[in-house]
Amino acid sequence: MRHELERLEQADYKEKLQGKAKPQMIFFTAEWSEPCRQMQGLVEELADAHYAQADFYQVDLDEQPLIAGDFNIAGVPALVICREGKEEERIVGLRAYPDLEKVVVKYL
């Protein structure tokens, strides 16, 4: 079953990330980026495999530039791993699924 990534919006994203026991995986993307399109499916696979242990979100760089600014996103694709809305680690650039999963499982 495919678990869609919940889209974060400026109005309420901080509330969504606070007070959660599970780690949050935030995928920063842009429609115009081919590497982002390629990595989208990989992040969705991660969400399918680990939805019970982590919350998965998506932020479009062009639609939500303030959120991207809050996380100092300079390039996409980027996967930011947070706890309670605070960054623990980030992966920047297109990566293979095993490389992504290796980092993600450290926080589950």
Set out the residue ranges of the language-model regions.
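Structural microenvironment flanking redox-active thiols in thiol-disulfide oxidoreductases
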Residues: 61-67
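N-terminal leader/targeting and pre-domain segments
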Residues: 1-24
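Non-catalytic, surface beta->alpha helical segment in thiol-disulfide oxidoreductase systems
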Residues: 75, 80-108
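A short glycine-leucine-enriched loop at secondary-structure breakpoints
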Residues: 70-74
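Short pre-active-site segment immediately N-terminal to redox-active cysteine/selenocysteine motifs
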Residues: 21, 28-32, 75
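Conserved helix-turn-beta segment immediately C-terminal to the redox Cys motif
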Residues: 21-23, 40-59
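Conserved redox-active cysteine motifs that mediate thiol-disulfide chemistry
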Residues: 28-42
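Structural signal for short hydrophobic segments within the conserved structured cores
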Residues: 6, 57, 88-91
